[in-house]
Each structure stands twice: as structure tokens, then as C-alpha cells.
């Protein structure tokens, strides 16, 4: 699943020449989708295919509904220092994993099928939390591996802001079962 960051009334960052992040991310997402779809063994889906707003949780829900194997959220940030440049890759932090697990446990609708189709409805709450924590930890490890691969590829075509995968608690990366990067 390819997520073009921002959209609709949420324009994201504004470039020095007046460009909007939402337009840049959508253009990149469409090009990436085409490149992936050109490989007969792969199929890409977009979380949004035009200029409209999709809530952060809705992006993750769509990826899960479409049974995505990976989730890539594309952003084109701006910074107050015009000298700042380069690409970065983020994965969810371990500290974010705990809050993601708590969020999913609190929401009974989403409790089932979070970890490989195993329903947690009939499990002891502590066991369910442990299973979600284990699933989230494994997913974060896979996300960092994916992020390192992407950084290697990006380094061949663009400057890197940081040469390692950074980790933070981005809401859009909090799927406990889909390796996700931003």
C-alpha cells in the first residue's frame, strides 16, 4: 500500500516556490505505483488516488482491508533552514508499540484479525496484550529492515538526510501486522 501523505484541505508543507506537499506526494505515489505494477508479481494500491483527505487511521484501515504486505507513507517535508535537504526513512518506535497495542486492545471492533487472523475476543486481556506486543515488535523489526533497504536504494538517487532509519510514534505507522515506513 502506497500512502500519498496529506490531501484535500490538509496541504502539508509548502515549498519555497509555493508547491504543496499533498501534490508532490500524490505524484510520487502514482509513479511508484506504476513502477511496482510493471512487475507482474507485484500489485500496488494507493490509500488516496486524488486530492482528498483521508484520516490517518483510515489509511491504515484501507491497507489492512486490502491485505497489504507493506505500507509506505510518502511525505515531502519542508524545513525552516533552506539548506536542509535529503531523504529520510522512519519506522515506528518501540515506545510507540506500547501505545499502539493499547489503542487496538481498547477498540474491540479491531481486536480480531490483528495478528494473522487470530481473534483475541476470547483471550485473557493480559494474553491479548502480550500477543499484540509480540506482533508489534516483530512488525517494527521488519519495518526497520524494509527502511534500511529503501535507504540503500534512495542513497543511489538522492542525498540522504540521515543514513539510518529513524523511529518515532507516527500514527500512520501503527499497524501491528503490516511492516510500515514513512
Language model regions located:
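Active-site-adjacent mobile loop/cap segments within catalytic or ligand-binding domains
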Residues: 80, 131-182
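Catalytic-core regions of hydrolytic enzymes
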Residues: 1-124, 136-148
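Exposed acidic/Ser/Thr-rich ligand/metal-binding surfaces
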Residues: 125-129
Amino acid at each position: 500500500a502506497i500512502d500519498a501523505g496529506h490531501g484535500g484541505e490538509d496541504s502539508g508543507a509548502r515549498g519555497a516556490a509555493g508547491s504543496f506537499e499533498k501534490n508532490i506526494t500524490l505524484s510520487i505515489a502514482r509513479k511508484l505505483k506504476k513502477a511496482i505494477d510493471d512487475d507482474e508479481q507485484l500489485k500496488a494500491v494507493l490509500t488516496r488516488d486524488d486530492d482528498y483527505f483521508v484520516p490517518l487511521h483510515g489509511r491504515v484501515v484501507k491497507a489492512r482491508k486490502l491485505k497489504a504486505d507493506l505500507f509506505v507513507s510518502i511525505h515531502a517535508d519542508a524545513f525552516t533552514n533552506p539548506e536542509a535537504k535529503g531523504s529520510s526513512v522512519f519506522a515506528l518506535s518501540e515506545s510507540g508499540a506500547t501505545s499502539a497495542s493499547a489503542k487496538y486492545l481498547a477498540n474491540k471492533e479491531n481486536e480480531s484479525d490483528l495478528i494473522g487472523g487470530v481473534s483475541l475476543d476470547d483471550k485473557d486481556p493480559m494474553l491479548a496484550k502480550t500477543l499484540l506486543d509480540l506482533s508489534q515488535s516483530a512488525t517494527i523489526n521488519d519495518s526497520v529492515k524494509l527502511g534500511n533497504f529503501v535507504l540503500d536504494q534512495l542513497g543511489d538517487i538522492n542525498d540522504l538526510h540521515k543514513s539510518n532509519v529513524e523511529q518515532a510514534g507516527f500514527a500512520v505507522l501503527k499497524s501491528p501486522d503490516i511492516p510500515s515506513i514513512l
